[in-house]
Amino acid sequence: AGGHLAQFLGVTAGVSEFEGDGGNAGQSSAVTCVVNVYGPSDFTKSYGKSVDAAEVLPLFLGGNLETQRFRHLLSSPLYWVTPRAAPTLCIHGTEDKYVAHEQAVWLVEKMKASGAEADLLTLPGAGHGFKGKDAETAEAALMAFFDKRLKK
């Protein structure tokens, strides 16, 4: 959920339907940048190779794709990409059985096509959750990305 929710914030800043009424109308909901670590971008397509996705998504979205297509679209960051999307780094392993690597590829391609800044760090052979050298590589990329965008 973390990668998906971070990415959703990165593409929906200023969209009135998502601003809410939490009493902070004077504060922007925009984020400076996003690191999406193996988060899904499109709930209407190949989510993963795991049976878990077919079981979990209906609980999260109130029904399966056939009965709640609108919610699946509405909840998918891929469909909210604009040139104003926050700069994004996606980090994803090619052997992720829960969220298919192509989810990151689709998002980065769409962001770049829109003119938004996006990069993809692909970790060959890595699954959902990084260990050892993959974890070190992901952490180094994440820290460099944040340092570039958040340090003044």
Describe the residue ranges of each PLM region.
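Alpha/beta-hydrolase superfamily serine-hydrolase fold, recognizing
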Residues: A1-K152
